[in-house]
């Protein structure tokens, strides 16, 4: 058993970082924002990429989860329900691809979600954000005229509730077999356990069944009320059988990311009077500013480091780069300009990972040098790259992740600075130049963003359609369409209607769970099949300033 007392000094700093009185929520978007006339060309280019990508999927993989664009085949890695079709529906509607949407709708009406089409277990997290989120978003964007989309989403959620295996269980298991409604008894991570409430509360809204909100919201409440190393920042792994953390690893990256993301988004989309969600998010941000924020010794880039049992790890990831947009969004809702300004700095640092590579596309993971932290030891080539760019690549592939362009979209809508339009345009050019698989004319990932000759990754992710192309399209769209003051995005880029904003979100006082942080070993339950814990060997770095 590891016991780490929460630092008392945080409580003093939090008063400095937060406002001293409750401030009215500000609009997320700047008023009267308009895109220049040149935006139309880039928006059309995004539509063309969508059509080209989806045409390849339709020819070689229709009805299956994902296209393999190099091998001219498909993979069913999301239970064989046609993840790409469902995930892409909202983007089809926004782009006015009515025929494609009608085809997708016809397909979705025939899916039997009561059983998996593969022997695999069903992931609560992936199924919720892609399938449930995709169908509910399409229901709303199509004018709420296709009740079958709600019915199908309900069918899925009615199966997933069995992941709460016992009557008093508040955190679900992460995987379940639909054939016998039996969950896999394993440790969960807080992202997968805490990224259900936005979507499930929408299913409650359209069905009246409060159980969906009770279960999904209850998981978040449990995690938020567990004492953590720093207020608001939970460790990554949690045991659903006893509600105890299983590690002491803190990150805004994979395994924790969307739990933190949804705290403020759930407060906004529900307008709940319970300040727990906004205040816990505020606490997480304040803790991150105090404990995780680092400035690289070269380039002065602002990063959020990871933390593991008292050790700062100077590493970042594409997944974590959602944080800039999330801080901009939440900072605006809390009317906290400090949070917004730091969010914009995080956006800059993440964009630098794109601007620094041969392809103009950012890597999966990277490290950097900053005071007071440890990092993976760079080789000579990485060290030379760091001297020029202020970071070095540790995992070089690009698997069509959206987070950098997602945060770029938030920064554009919140500031009106056209540099964000220029960056989005450069990403379009890079995608057109480097991602096309000649075998299918579809779009693939990259094995090495800094060496195009390393070839393409043989996969077209469903979130290429749901997120990457949607965020790019909306960046060049009329800002009044899908305004950030009227809509909330789930972590898969699915768009949901939001009620008129409240006057105030949160109490202006970051919430800290009472008690002493405790963590245990994972002897009682198996870890997830693919643990999200970092695999990189971290050692003290003697290279500060190089």
Where are these regions (language model features)?
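Glycan-recognition and catalytic cores of secretory/periplasmic carbohydrate-active enzymes
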Residues: 26-546
């Amino acid at each position: 058993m590891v016991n780490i007392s929460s630092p008392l000094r945080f409580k003093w700093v939090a008063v400095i970082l937060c406002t001293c009185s409750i401030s009215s929520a500000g609009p997320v978007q700047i008023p009267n924002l308009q895109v220049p006339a040149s935006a139309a060309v880039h928006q059309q280019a995004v539509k063309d990429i969508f059509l080209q990508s989806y045409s390849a999927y339709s020819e070689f993989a229709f009805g299956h989860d994902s296209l393999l664009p190099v091998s001219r085949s498909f993979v069913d890695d999301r239970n064989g329900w046609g993840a790409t079709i469902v995930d892409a529906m909202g983007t089809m509607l926004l782009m006015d691809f009515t025929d494609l949407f009608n085809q997708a709708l016809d397909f979705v009406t025939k899916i039997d979600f009561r059983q998996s089409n593969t022997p695999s277990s069903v992931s609560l997290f992936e199924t919720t954000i892609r399938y449930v989120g995709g169908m509910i978003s399409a229901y709303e964007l199509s004018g709420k005229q296709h009740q079958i989309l709600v019915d199908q989403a309900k069918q899925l959620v009615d199966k997933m509730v069995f992941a709460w295996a016992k009557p008093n269980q508040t955190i679900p298991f992460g995987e379940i077999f639909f054939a016998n409604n039996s969950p896999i008894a394993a440790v969960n991570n807080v992202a997968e356990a805490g990224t259900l409430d936005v979507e499930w509360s929408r299913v409650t809204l359209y069905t009246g069944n409060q159980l969906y909100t009770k279960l999904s919201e209850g998981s978040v409440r449990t995690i938020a009320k567990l004492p953590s190393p720093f207020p608001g920042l939970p460790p990554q792994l949690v045991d659903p059988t006893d509600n105890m953390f299983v590690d002491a690893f803190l990150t805004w990256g994979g395994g924790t990311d969307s739990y933190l993301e949804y705290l403020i988004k759930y407060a906004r989309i529900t307008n709940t009077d319970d300040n727990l969600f906004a205040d816990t998010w505020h606490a997480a941000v304040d803790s991150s500013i105090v404990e995780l924020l680092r400035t690289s010794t070269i380039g002065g880039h602002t990063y959020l480091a990871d933390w593991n049992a008292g050790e700062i790890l100077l590493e970042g990831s594409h997944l974590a780069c959602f944080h800039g947009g999330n801080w901009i969004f939440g900072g605006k809702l809390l009317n906290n300009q400090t949070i917004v300004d730091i969010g914009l700095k995080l956006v800059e640092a993440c964009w630098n990972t794109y601007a620094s590579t041969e392809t103009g596309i950012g890597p999966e993971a990277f490290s950097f040098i900053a005071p007071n932290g440890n990092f993976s030891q760079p080789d000579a080539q990485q060290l030379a790259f760091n001297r020029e760019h202020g970071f070095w690549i540790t995992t070089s592939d690009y698997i069509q992740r959206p987070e950098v362009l997602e945060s770029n979209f938030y920064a554009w809508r919140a500031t009106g600075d056209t540099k964000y339009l220029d960056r989005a345009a450069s990403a379009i050019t890079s995608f057109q130049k480097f991602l096309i698989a000649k075998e299918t004319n579809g779009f693939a990932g990259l094995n090495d963003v800094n060496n195009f000759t390393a070839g393409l990754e043989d996969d077209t992710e469903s979130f290429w359609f749901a997120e990457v192309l949607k965020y790019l399209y909306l960046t060049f769209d009329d800002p009044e369409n899908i305004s950030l003051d009227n809509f909330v995005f789930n972590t898969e880029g699915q768009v949901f209607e939001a009620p008129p904003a409240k006057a105030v979100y949160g109490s202006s006082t970051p919430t800290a769970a009472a008690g002493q942080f405790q963590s245990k070993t994972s002897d009682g339950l198996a870890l997830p099949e693919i643990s999200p814990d970092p695999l990189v060997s971290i050692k003290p770095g003697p290279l500060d300033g190089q």
